Every structure is written in structure tokens, then in C-alpha cells.
Amino acid sequence: MKGNFLWKKWGSILCCLGVIGGCFLHTAWRGEDAIFPMMDAVIVLDAGHGGWDPGRKGTAGVDEKELNLAVVEKLADYLEQGGAEVILTRESDDALGGKKQSDMAERKKIANESGADILVSIHQNAFPSPKAKGAQVFYHNNSGNGKVLAECVQESLRSRVDGSNQRQAKENKDYYILRTTEIPAVIVECGFLSNAEEERLLNDDTYQEKLAWAIYCGILDYFEKSSII
């Protein structure tokens, strides 16, 4: 992923200069560390679903699993360029098990054996009402650091992607990946595939870059607040 990042992403980065500039200014106080602000961080990125499990299906037929992996790949590029070690639960359109239970158990195993600082799981939302929209971040109700991470990412998504999004980071006690991982973990629902306009945006490469950058900046804000790295 690292080799040709600047060339491969240049066009999309130009489109995101406004939000990018804001995040670099946010880290400038760290001096030369701002060149690699994620140095020493280890992060697990989980692209939800995959293979036989397509996840949600959009109004135009887009499979959630494809969008999840696309955002994860872009986010991984940003994190690695920032100096982080990134561990992916999947790198292609493959499930991690033949059934949902074994698939989720393998994701948990990867996270818990990784020695990582955090886990970020990327998903897309859906709702019966086609009007529902906006990214939202979930954390486990018993994870204090998970809450801080979720709030940092939620605020970054609001300020860098959609200022009209009034959704707040939300606790959840039932999501498997949140309740079984031993490190701070969040699920980022990037938007609603049940909303035709938001589905169109989520399927757009430049918008995916914008989402990935906002999540990256939220993660960086978390590490600055927690002083983990």
C-alpha cells in the first residue's frame, strides 16, 4: 500500500485539501513528529462483511461489503503514511469463515492477538425510512477509551464531512466486535445505503477519501488525548 501512495491518491487528495490542511494544522504543534504523527501506533482495521456475506444492499444495488473494503483501504493508506502499523482483518472480498459465527470469531481473534492499540470496524447503515442519513460511530458501554475514540471520530466526521450531521457517538452493549475485543474498539457506520443520495456519495471515490481522512484525523485526535503514542 505504501509505495505509490502519493501518486495513486494525488487526484483525490487535491479534492480534499481543505480538510487535509485542517488536520495537519491540528498536529503541527508536535514539531518533527508531525511528519509521522502515528509512529508506534498499531491499529486493526476491520472491513465488515465480505465473501458470501454482502451486508446491506443499497437502493441502487451496491453491496456494503465493497464500500467497507474501499474505505478501509484508503484509511489504511493514510494511517501507514502517518507511521502506524496497520493490521487488516481482510484485504479482499473474502469472508473469514463459512458461517457468521466463525467469521466474527476470527475477526475477534485477529484483534485480540494483534497487540494493537485500537480497532476500527467500517460498516454502512440502513433504515426503513429513506430519509435517514449521516455517519455514526458506536462503542461498547463498558469501554471508557472506546467512548473517547468514538467521540473523536464522530466529531471529525461532522466537522470534515457533513456539518449538518447531528448524530452523536452512541454506546452499544450487543455488537459482537465491540463486546468481545480486549482493546478500545469502534464501529463506524459511514452512512445510509437506504438513502439514495447518500448511497451515491458512499459509492464515490472522492467521498470515500474524505471519509477516510476524517476517520484518520479522529483517530489522531484520540491518540493525542490519550497519550498512548
Each model region followed by its residue ranges:
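Catalytic-site microenvironment of enzymes
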Residues: 1-229
